[in-house]
Regions:
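Catalytic cores of eukaryotic secretory-pathway lumenal/extracellular enzymes that build
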Residues: 157-159, 173-174, 192-193, 213-216, ...
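Extracellular ligand-binding/catalytic regions of CAZymes and related secreted enzymes
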Residues: 6-38, 316-395
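Hydrophobic targeting/anchoring helices
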Residues: 1-102, 111
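Helical hinge/lid and interdomain linker segments adjacent to catalytic or ligand-binding clefts
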Residues: 1-2, 6, 37-47, 98-205, ...
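Structural recognition of the beta-strand scaffold that forms the well-ordered cores
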Residues: 28, 90-91, 117, 134-136, ...
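Extracellular/periplasmic catalytic domains that process cell-envelope and extracellular macromolecules
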Residues: 82-85, 126-129, 191, 339-341
Length: 395
């Protein structure tokens, strides 16, 4: 899985296939040649690698034992983790087509990793415990419909989104989309508390925490939920309910394409596409196993990419949250992780790792052009994370 791998993304799909279809043991060699996978040889496996265009090496048992000995050496920053089973993956997404792509469903489809699309019905009807891993992407859990009202209030897709959400709210006995999304947020919290793995990108990161903090107040203006925002909405925020963020300030204007100051302001970042980068931390694979798994890559420097939520102001991140990827000069975090109850969550800023500034209505990214994308690899690390046999973080 180093620089000579022809298709990093599909390699994850082969590992998933081994777990799912062959019930074969897969070893994840952390920090060994870019985080490689090792499994017992079979002609089916070799054929699968060839079919998917994944680079591989057939080695002897002696060579495999030598690799294991090298990794076990206390002086090297490597580790070997068993992948135990194929996680059951759910993607929270409307069943109707959206005018933007979803990086996770794109890379899952490209890597040939199966997933199930669920939405409000399934969440509120108690289906989440059927899954190990849940993805949230370009979603607005505050009930403000992505704050697209100012620019797209008459667009057919926006009108349909509002109508569908309000219909769903009435179906479940709620007065507004805001109340519906609050109930969904609390169900997702239950899923995590019970041991589920949550992965969120773009606006699903900050709006999830905002909705948790605002569960006992109203942060929506009249055009979103039929009544006005609570005059004391800011003062009524309960940050203790948040997964990752603290002390943020709401963006109350319905004309502003922001939810709060959690997200960095693109107009103030003073960075170009060429210089917009973030760095992954080099964790100890033996002692800090969880972040080491989530940061496996063939490079420590990853190209940045924008989204409605691009990156997080570090000053607004809770002290017990791991910042795994950052731009230190800009004081912003891009990739963070934490524990909640028996489960975990990972938040990843930005919309599409290979489309720097994805706009509404643009065609989806063709991953055939980006088979070695470091940004997409981070997503796939999270996909296999629930399968890994791991111990508690030591430092």
């Amino acid at each position: 899985m180093g620089e000579d791998q022809k298709n990093h993304l599909k390699a994850y799909g082969v590992a998933f296939w081994l777990l799912d279809k062959q019930q074969s043991e897969v070893l994840w060699l952390l920090n060994y040649q870019g985080g490689s996978f090792m499994s017992a040889y079979s002609s089916k496996l070799e054929t699968e690698c060839k079919t998917r265009g994944v680079s591989y090496s057939v080695i002897s048992e002696t060579a495999a034992n030598q690799i294991e000995s090298e990794i076990a050496n206390p002086s090297v920053n490597m580790n070997m983790v068993k992948l135990l089973n194929a996680p059951k993956i759910a993607v929270y997404s409307p069943k109707t087509k959206q005018p933007w792509d979803d990086a996770v469903t794109m890379v899952l489809s490209y890597a040939e990793i199966p997933y199930t699309v669920i939405f409000d019905d399934e969440v509120l009807n108690g289906k989440l415990p059927q899954f190990d891993w849940l993805h949230l992407h370009h979603e607005d859990f505050t009930g403000q419909y992505g704050k697209f009202w100012a620019s797209f209030s008459t667009a057919p897709w926006y009108v349909d989104q509002v109508n569908e959400t309000e219909s769903m709210a009435r179906k479940h006995g709620f007065k507004s989309g805001r109340e519906l999304k609050r109930a969904v947020v609390l169900k997702i919290r239950e899923f995590c508390m019970g041991g589920g793995f949550l992965f969120a990108m773009c606006s699903a990161t900050d709006t999830y925490d905002i909705a948790l903090a605002a569960q006992n107040t109203d942060v929506c203006e009249r055009m979103f939920d039929g009544d006005g925002i609570s005059p004391s909405a800011q003062q009524d925020l309960e940050y203790q309910h948040c997964f990752a963020f603290k002390n943020f300030t709401l963006e109350r204007s319905p004309y502003a394409y922001e939810f709060s100051d959690i997200d960095v302001d693109p107009t103030r970042r003073n960075v170009s596409e060429e210089t917009d980068l973030f760095t992954l931390f080099d964790y100890s694979a033996k002692w800090d196993l969880i972040p080491a798994i989530l940061c496996q890559n063939h490079t420590r420097t990853v190209r940045g990419f924008m989204g409605q939520t691009t990156a997080f102001h570090k000053d607004l991140i809770k002290s017990d949250i791991l910042v795994m990827g950052e731009n230190a000069l800009l004081n912003e975090a891009r990739y963070i992780h934490g524990e909640i109850g028996k489960g975990t969550f990972t938040f990843y800023g930005g919309h599409d790792p290979e489309d720097y500034q994805h706009h509404v209505g643009e065609p989806p990214t063709d991953l055939n052009l980006h088979p070695n994308s470091p940004g997409f690899r981070l997503i796939l690390n999270n996909i296999l994370f629930p399968s890994a046999q791991k111990s508690k973080q030591k430092t």
